Amino acid sequence: MSGTTPDGSPGPGSSSAAIRLGTVVLDCPDPHALARFYSGLLGQPVDPDGDDDWQSLAGNGSGVVLAFQRAARHVPPSWPDGAPQQLHLDLTVQDMATAHARAIELGARPLDPEADPASDEPRRFRVYADPAGHPFCLCR
């Protein structure tokens, strides 16, 4: 349903009523370091307007920005454990072995080390932690 409601206000689906995701922010102890990690992993440049407390990647055309905010008392999430994850990123890749090697080179830590990315049996995803401990997946 789109358009207006009976009282004339914007209805669901109306562009003026839409709420859109603009930025995903990861808390971390070092925004510069985490921005460099994701810049290298995603191939997006770091926005030059950041500072010591806030860094972000330049847009990728999706309209969603990935940003990194200093949190002095950041505690990395633990995975896996009994508590549910608060958030993780699913990053789409074409070649799992190449993406795995790049993630490791940049400082990612595999969280499912029993999986072999070069195996003949294709895996649909691999789970990692970024340098600040946030979980993310590389997904086919």
Protein language model features and the residues they cover:
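Acetyl-CoA-dependent GNAT
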Residues: 69-74
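Surface-exposed beta-strand edges and their flanking turn/coil or helix-capping segments
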Residues: 6, 39-41, 79-83, 102-104, ...
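Vicinal oxygen chelate
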Residues: 2-29, 48-49, 56-60, 64, 77-102, ...
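Amphipathic alpha-helical segments
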Residues: 30-45, 103-107
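N-terminal presequences and immediately downstream first alpha-helices
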Residues: 25, 36-57
